[in-house]
């Protein structure tokens, strides 16, 4: 053991030890309790950033802690390697995405290993490898057979110059990020997964997720968006057709003054053929972004279709407007507008001089100016004929029943959740295993022809679809009739890859089936760690896919992740670290200067995992100083500990002196609190406990036999508490001080109940119920000793002067009250 702390050397030695001994390679063992710890897999951008390091350090602390607790721990790592960023980088660098991606993976794998994470690298997966995505294609075929994968027209952002579909984030001020062309809304045929078939179960099973953050549960609940409402039929004034409207407010039905339909509604398209004005309006609507949030915040615009519908109750004529705020994807693409009781409808009605008809007044009877604002709260019905004077809640049921009995409507449970559109008109993704034949139609690729390989030598230009221009890919033969046919050139949304990867880690070497029985052993994941930005997309899709895999008999649990931790962001100068802000601190530079353990210690100590972490250079320096202090202390006590650790009776030492028992009590109290905090994932306060223990131990001397044994016990506790957080220095010191071989083979420390037993108690002394002092007495002191000690306390004596004591009441182990 060197006198000075040399992190680069000891970290290299520890990492070599773990690799040579395959320390973190695990096998299934039914005799042991398993623990599956997983951090969200990274996109291989080429460089780890501090957000990565924080995420993975938190996960590693949990995994190593569970190893110490004797569990069979799996902590794997892999790469979410497909997707748009790689395609964009390839366009800029003029090289294939495959080449760029694999180079980045190699670089990032090295960076992760430098941080000493306890990963089972034998299970590494890369989602752009055909050995991975062939099973995704197999899964797609199973969904297709069950009717859970289907194709329909849907609206996308279309760049007319680059002839490609754009993601919302690729649009800047309404224009394509590369071409600068005005983006259009275009309807194209796309593949969907029927997640809506699982809406009810996805919602219900949120109640099972007792160890997920409430915020994530709420976000998913809102995203699924269950509502109880009514489908109402509005017959067109002319002809047999009708419009169906879904509403959660049937109590406002008598206040409908117009209907609004989506620009993509068949009725709107039909009217555009007969009206240039309507055609021009629909063309303008095509230049609106597809995102629901953008549509909600844009200026409300519309045009009168010239058509009328008939109110199902009053039989009044209602004008039908085409409006840019109505979504074709929501319900039936038709809205019943009640401007007196809906803010958006109110805004639109005022703009186009449409009538307002109040049908609900405040329950307390106070006046409301409906021209100024919509009244959106519950109340009492007015201007509603036979429904007048009914309260809103009752009116919901009364009107719903009336509509049902008269064939004009029906109750319906509705979900905001839409089917998952997985088609991407991009190159760098999993090919969808479908063939189109002029004779046989849509034909799934036979399972024995999987995988449909993605050509990896393509250099995308950003114009059009590279796969549509690659004849060697799309030209094929129909597996049914053997005539010339074409492959599907859309690829899958990368969220598909990340929706089942956690299960594949259990059996990445399996080439006969998607998942084998090892997946049933390891899943569900016991602890999942990742950012809250994935609350509704990734986490919802993974929950959906888990239920699919369960229904296919591949898994035997309902949910993929038992416990979820959403770590906070890493901030510098109050803002999230980013290259654009110029506030990035690179992990590599810090590891080189201070070592990985210092980086890990700072990240864990600076803030609780779920809170944002404010970067502090002085905090990093402080972490480094602490590790140097620990090293210096260990070097000083090395010889004494080596000698004690060779003794057979070292663990049965009895401390007799009160001061030594008190010191031992302090150490075990720190340990007791650290164990509570470890279970609560409050790792920053575990570090605080470690620092307290070191400060206690430094004051002791190895020249005194009792204190030397205290140092040995305390150091053994300290190193194990630090082991998950700063594994390299803990590993090295454990061996150098003679505690044994691998620190990970030792059980997690538990406080000694005897050490926690106090020898003295503090009692409150009251006179006539008022606090007058505090006394220290032996734990088992008699009533007489307690009384005597209290009456001799200086402040008590002062308050008793010239007073007559009537009685003394002793409440055991709490207080003594002197009545005068």
Curated annotation (Swiss-Prot):
SUPFAM superfamilies in the cross-refs: Anticodon-binding domain of a subclass of class I aminoacyl-tRNA synthetases, Nucleotidylyl transferase, ValRS/IleRS/LeuRS editing domain
Binding site for ATP: 579
InterPro entries in UniProt: aa-tRNA-synth_I_CS, aa-tRNA-synth_Ia, Leu-tRNA-ligase, Leu_tRNA-synth_edit, M/V/L/I-tRNA-synth_anticd-bd, Methionyl/Leucyl_tRNA_Synth, Rossmann-like_a/b/a_fold, tRNAsynth_Ia_anticodon-bd
Keywords annotated in UniProt: Aminoacyl-tRNA synthetase, ATP-binding, Cytoplasm, Ligase, Nucleotide-binding, Protein biosynthesis
Motif 'KMSKS' region per UniProt: ranges: 576-580
GO MF: aminoacyl-tRNA deacylase activity; ATP binding; leucine-tRNA ligase activity
Reactions listed under catalytic activity: tRNA(Leu) + L-leucine + ATP = L-leucyl-tRNA(Leu) + AMP + diphosphate
GO cellular component assignments: cytosol
Positions of short motif 'HIGH' region: 42-52
EC number: 6.1.1.4
Protein name: Leucine--tRNA ligase
Annotated organism of origin: Coxiella burnetii (strain RSA 493 / Nine Mile phase I)
